């Protein structure tokens, strides 16, 4: 049993349910988008991001356990992450991810761009339905950060003089922002105080910078 599996064991069943629910949520009635979504969520991966959100949610709400809104937040987190990967693969012209054909390789670039857009739109829709403006602000900031991080990466791709602080800022936008703000959003949904919300944000940010592979 590896470390990630051990870490996520308390929410293993919840993660299985999450993947099934994601496939249902993405099924938009359009056969190509539905096929792309099925392909995306059948490609494996650690599901570490939604797993961390679920673990945090359980830890800060031991009396009530996971609520429907906490579970939906975890689903939104994975939708945003997956949408960003689809777009990244197009920009990077990657043919495979985790040993599986990327969406634009299996279908085409147009379908991949639209599939990524559709996932972002779905995430935004379900985010709005949480009926919590502070959570909406946190996750909307993430989507802005993802776009900003990708732009920074491509503008500085061949800049060997790039400062370490610029590199860290780019990496925060592309990776750490999502889990940091999702952890904080879990706390917002649980109604915890501002000091603990800051601690959740800091935990997500520092944890994500501390692990060797964040893709």
Question: What do the predicted segments below correspond to?
Answer:
Residues 1-24:
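N-terminal amphipathic/basic leader segments beginning at the initiator methionine
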Residues 16, 23-214:
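Mg2+-dependent prenyl diphosphate-binding active-site environment of isoprenoid biosynthetic enzymes
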